[in-house]
Structures are given as C-alpha cells and as structure tokens.
Design a protein with these regions (language model features):
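N-terminal active-site segment of His-dependent metallophosphoesterases
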Residues: 1-62, 102
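Active-site-proximal beta-strand elements of phosphoester/diester hydrolases
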Residues: 1-13, 112-122, 151-153, 206-212, ...
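Active-site neighborhood of phospho(di)ester-bond hydrolases with catalytic His/Asp-centered motifs
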Residues: 5-7, 43-50, 74-80, 119, ...
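Active-site environment of divalent metal-dependent phosphoester hydrolases
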Residues: 11-14, 53-58, 80-88, 123-126, ...
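Short glycine-enriched, charge-decorated loop/helix-capping segments at active-site entrances
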Residues: 17-23, 93, 124, 163-170, ...
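His/acidic metal-ligating clusters that form di-metal
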Residues: 30-44, 127-207, 231, 236-239, ...
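Extended active-site neighborhood of metal-dependent phosphoesterases/phosphodiesterases
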Residues: 57-144, 149, 176-186, 223-242
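His/Asp/Glu-enriched short active-site or ligand-binding loop at hydrolase and phosphoryl-transfer sites
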Residues: 211-222
Length: 265
C-alpha cells in the first residue's frame, strides 16, 4: 500500500500570496500533479492540516476547487490555521468526519493500513493538546484492531523540536499520548504536519515523523534567541510505503523538475 502525505498547503484566495512571498495555490496544484505522475500512483493521500491559511469560506472554496483535480482518495484533518466549522462544511461529503466536536476518526477501507486520525487542534489557538478524552478515544480505537498495521495522523507534533518558535506551538500532552501508543504495537508510524519541515524521532515505542509543507519551509534555527522566519526551500511531501515483509518505509520527495534520471555508470 502506497500512502502520500501532503501537509500545510495554506491555500489562499485567488491572487493572494502566502506570507506575501509564495503562490501556495500554484504550489499545491503542482504537488497534486506530482502525485499523479508517480508510478505506481498512491492508493491514498493524507492531508495533515493547515489546508488553508485564514480559515475563511473563500479559501475553502479555492481548496475544494484544487482538490477536484485530485484523482486519488484522500483523508483530511484540520490544523491550527483551519476553522473547524468552515472545515467541516467544506468537507461535508467526507462522511468519515464526525458531525460535531473534535474530528477524530478511523478509516480502514483503502488498503492494508488503517488510518487513525487524532484531532489535537484547539479552536483559536496555535498549539495543540492531547486531552484525557482524546487519549481515551485513541486507546479504545487502537484496541479494536490490534493486528492491523496502523498510522496515527495528527497536526501538531507532540515533542520539542529544538526550534524555539515552533516549540511554543507544539502539541501538549505528549507523555499522555506516548503512554497510549506504547500499549499498541501495531502503530507503525505517527505522522504530523505543522512544522513545515521533515523531522523524525522515536516516540511511544514507534516512529514519529513530520511532513514538509507544499509551500514555504520554516527556517531551521536552533538558537534560543532565534526569530520566526521562512525559507523558499523546495516544497516536498512524504510517501509511506507499506509491505508486509518490510513494514512501513517513509520516503521524502522534493517537488519540482530536477535533472535526470541518469543511468548508473
């Protein structure tokens, strides 16, 4: 099973640049085209939050226009830049989304790997949290299929990155989440967005990775006094490849037209 993860496209209204520097809409369209060019194509696309930038209806209308060109099934979760009500309205045809409250869900109909989405967003705030109710829901949901390889998807990552301005807006309650995940050995990966960079660490007895953005990259600055900044690095996405004999292998794919391929000499 091949699962693409696109994150943080920050779609804007037509003609408006993201952060005044990037045409995030055009970049997202290119990312979708890159998915279609893969051979084999992914079986599923995960969209791991911050699908629009300001949470407005015009942005969601533009997002749905762009997603009409996506020929692969997709699963979505909100990020801190999304508005929960507007998000739910925009994706009212996605019947796996709950009608009210946090957008937790589990879907296992697209292939061998089950996707369990944990909504850690807090309306009106940029940091996230795993509360007791969310942890209990996750524990019970994972217990339902203990033998099924599973990806847990959430937006804000539950660890300190070392980038000071990112860590202000991390997901709180990481120890609570780790305690739950460590009880369920079928969790092959926790996948997040939010930080606009690829990061990887061990967490709760499994691997956790964050996806890059399809638009700007948040600057990698590890000094305590560093100020928030973005770079126009090549956008990218992740490709998670499940094979029973191997497990889940995650690939990082920059988006763009690059020279090659060149045969090995």
């Amino acid at each position: 099973m091949l699962i693409a993860q696109l994150s943080d496209p920050h779609v804007r209204p037509d003609g408006v640049l993201y952060q005044d520097v990037a045409d995030s809409n055009a970049q997202f369209a290119v990312a979708i085209a890159e998915l279609h060019a893969l051979d084999p194509r992914p079986d599923l696309v995960l969209l791991s939050g911050d699908l629009v930038d300001k949470g407005t209806p015009p942005e969601y209308a533009k997002l749905r226009e762009l997603l009409r060109g996506l020929e692969i099934p997709s699963l979505v979760i909100p990020g801190n830049h999304d508005d929960r009500d507007a998000f739910r309205s925009a994706f009212r045809d996605h019947d796996y989304l709950p009608a009210a409250g946090p957008m937790h869900y589990a879907v296992g109909t697209h292939g061998a790997v089950r996707i369990v989405a944990l909504d850690v967003t807090l309306p009106g705030l940029h940091h996230g949290a795993v509360d007791e109710a969310g942890a209990r829901w996750l524990d019970e949901t994972l217990a339902q299929e203990p033998a099924r390889p599973t990806i847990v998807m959430m937006h804000q990552p539950p660890f300190e990155t070392g980038v000071p301005y990112l860590d202000l807006y991390a997901c709180r309650g990481g120890q609570r989440l780790a305690a739950v995940v460590s009880r369920h050995r079928q969790v092959e990966r926790i996948v997040c967005g939010h930080v606009h960079r690829f990061m990887l660490l061990r967490f709760g007895g499994t691997l956790l990775c964050t996806a890059p953005s399809t638009t700007t990259a948040i600057a990698l600055q590890l000094r305590p006094e560093a100020k928030p900044a973005s770079h126009l690095e090549p956008p990218a996405f992740l490709l998670h490849h499940w094979r029973p004999e191997t497990g889940l292998v995650t690939h990082f794919l920059p988006i763009g037209a690059f020279p090659g391929p060149y045969p090995f000499a």
